[in-house]
Amino acid sequence: KRLLNNTTPDTDLLYDMLLEAKEYGCEYVVMEVSSHALDKNRVFGLEFDEVAFTNLTQDHLDYHKTLENYANAKRKLFEKTRGEKVAIINKDDPHHEKFMLNENKNITIGKNDADVLIKNYSLSHLHTKIQFSYEDKIYDTQINMVGSYNVYNYLTALMLVHKLGFS
């Protein structure tokens, strides 16, 4: 067990952790890479098979100063993919176009004109029911999380796993 001070550890510790995971037989790593880490090159040398963008908020403006700087830091993750790789993008976020790079296989999530189309969702105090379509099929599901942002988080995670080949 390690206690980490940052969402994304410093480069040396991160590489140590990845090597240790590989030694234990780990085939996949799912990690959050913070905008601070991208700005400070903590993931230097790593390439990602899949990346995701859910939203851009005012959260880290104390560090980045402007939304433009914040978006540019996050965009670095989308530039660190190997070849044409999967990029899951929340099309309903007003900044989504900044992350839609031609060299990536962009898959959009949204309420209008998206690859993963959110048809409907309803929130209760215990769960969220979601109806969405993907590749001409309609799906109904329920998650034990509330908040409209969790609709996007769930569908993003679902698509990342699906694109890795899991059903």
Model feature map: region roles:
Residues 24-26, 48-167:
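Acidic, Mg2+-coordinating active-site environments of NTP-dependent enzymes
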